[in-house]
Amino acid sequence: MLNIFKIKGDSMVPTIMSGSYVFTCYLNDYDIGNLIVLRISEKMHIVKRITAKNDGKYQIVGDNKNTSSSFCDYTYSNEAIIGRVIFIFNPVWKFSKFVRSIKNLLRYEKNYGSRNN
């Protein structure tokens, strides 16, 4: 099953920025290095990276070395995992490309004007 989550917070920077969306897919087994979304409570989900796997339990960590999370002090079973992150969409990246293209277009128009005149 495919799920989509909006990310809030900086624990996964620079891999995932706050405001990004992650798409996840449930698997029966996960590997070290996978990015996963975990269900902490009914209304709380977190995204972290798997760093160790032992007896069906997973140890996790955030990618941001400047932050820490108490959630990383525990191990989690498959039942807590909603899915592996398969795609990250960052609207800010797309918007910055859009702004850059508009600036380039305006610069071109200013320098060269319309060729139809």
Where do the language-model regions lie?
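Extended hydrophobic leader/signal-anchor segments used for secretion and membrane insertion
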Residues: M1-N117
